[in-house]
Every structure is written in C-alpha cells, then in structure tokens.
Design a protein with these regions (language model features):
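A short core secondary-structure module
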Residues: 53, 57-103, 136
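Structural signature of FAD isoalloxazine-binding scaffolds in flavoprotein oxidoreductases
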Residues: 39-43, 124
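A short, Trp-centered hydrophobic/proline-enriched beta-strand micro-motif
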Residues: 23-31
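Short Gly/Pro-enriched turn/cap motifs at secondary-structure boundaries
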Residues: 35-38, 62-65, 80-82, 106-113
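Residue-level signal for inorganic ion chemistry
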Residues: 9, 91, 119
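N-terminal glycine-rich flavin-associated loop
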Residues: 1-11, 37-40
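Glycine-rich beta->alpha junctions and the first turn(s) of the following alpha-helix
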Residues: 100-216
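A structural signal for short hydrophobic beta-strand segments in well-ordered beta-sheet cores
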Residues: 45-48
C-alpha cells in the first residue's frame, strides 16, 4: 500500500488499493536473495523485457508467508550493465502462475513463517489490467521505491501500539473500520485520498517512535 500511494500511478492505485483496504488480497515481499542479504543491492534476480511481458528468473529467500500470499512485490534487475544501485526495478507479480513456486523454511521451533521463492521463466504481463503497469515507479529506479518502503516499515514498527492501527490487527481494522460489504472505503477515490492523508501523518509517527524508544 505505501509504495503504491507514493510511487503508483492513478490506475495502479484504483486497481490495487481497494482490495488491499478490504483485506481481500495478501502480499509478500521479495527482496533478500541467498547471495544478497545484507548487501541487498547486489541482487541478481533477472527480469527481461520480452515485448508484451516480463520474464523473471531467480530466487528470493526469507519471504514471509509467501506460500499463503496472492501477490508479491519483487526487486529485480532489469539492466545488468548498470551500476549496483541502478538497473533495479520494483515489479508486482501474481503468485498464482506457472514459474512461481515457494518452499517453506522450517525453523528450530517447527514453524515455517518464511519461504524460499523461486522464479523459473515466470511470465508477468506488462499490464495487469488496461493501464495498470506491473512496474511501480520508474524503470530501473526500483531502489528508490524499496528504500522508501523500508523507511515506512521502520516508522510503523517504532510507533508500536500507538501507530495507525492502535495495536489492532489488519484483519480487525478491515472488518470493523472498513467493512467488506458496506465499508467506508468502498469508493476507490476515497481509498487514495485516505492513503495520502496517512502519508502526511508519517512525520508524527516518527516523533512518536522516538519518544517510545527513549522510554525503553
């Protein structure tokens, strides 16, 4: 949601934000790779332009709940000749397709919240719907989108229970505050406006996070 609100086109927002707000689709994050963990910009997951679609090959690791997700936002290398922090794009991929597979990573606790995610000649259309590009932000500038999203996540975490959700789960917010049938955000234009207002609130979250951390 935050990446689309900041970098998404109007068409991307109208297509994706309403079902996100209603809790109808679940996303996972495809950043880390087996050989690109702390040095994320060295990622090698390759995305080739094939005219009317993208062809993705590579692997991601530590993908939280990838086996239960509907979509994944992935950092891919679209220009192998560019410098390390450039030539990376931020792409949205449907998990339910040929060429995309997951393998849960079993932890010592016996639980498997993380997965390996594989892309083997995975085909992603240039547009998921008319005018709805698979790429978020500018081509080869996905690093900017990723940095913004990581910063946003840290601010939400630092705010703790005093954040936008007030300590509640996303499902509870969707059911009680938004509603799946007659929700307040059934109007997609209102979804976009509400998201933009939330972004304006981020500086306040940053201050709240600092105050909370000082008390720890």
């Amino acid at each position: 949601g935050p990446a689309l609100l900041k970098y998404g086109t109007h068409e991307q927002k109208l297509h994706f934000l309403p079902p996100i707000a209603r809790g109808e689709i679940r996303w996972c994050q495809g950043y880390s790779e087996p050989n690109a963990g702390s040095d994320l910009a060295s990622l090698q997951c390759k995305c080739e332009d094939k005219g009317d679609h993208w062809l993705i090959n590579g692997q991601k690791i530590w993908t939280s709940y990838a086996d239960e997700s509907d979509w994944i936002f992935v950092l891919v290398r679209t220009d192998p000749k560019a410098t390390k922090h450039t030539g990376i794009s931020f792409i949205l991929v449907d998990m339910d397709q040929k060429g995309v597979s997951t393998k849960p990573i079993k932890l010592i606790s016996g639980k498997s919240p993380f997965c390996e995610t594989f892309f083997d000649d995975a085909t992603t259309p240039k547009e998921h719907a008319p005018g709805v590009s698979a790429i978020v932000g500018e081509m080869n500038k996905g690093w900017d989108v990723a940095k913004y999203l990581l910063t946003h996540e840290r601010e939400m975490i630092s705010a703790g229970g005093g954040g936008l959700l007030g300590g509640r789960g996303m499902g509870e917010v969707a059911a009680n505050d938004i509603g799946l049938e007659n929700g307040k955000l059934s109007d997609p234009e209102l979804v976009i406006k509400s998201g933009e207002d939330a972004l304006d609130y981020v500086p306040d979250l940053r201050g709240a996070g600092r105050r909370l951390c000082r008390r720890c």
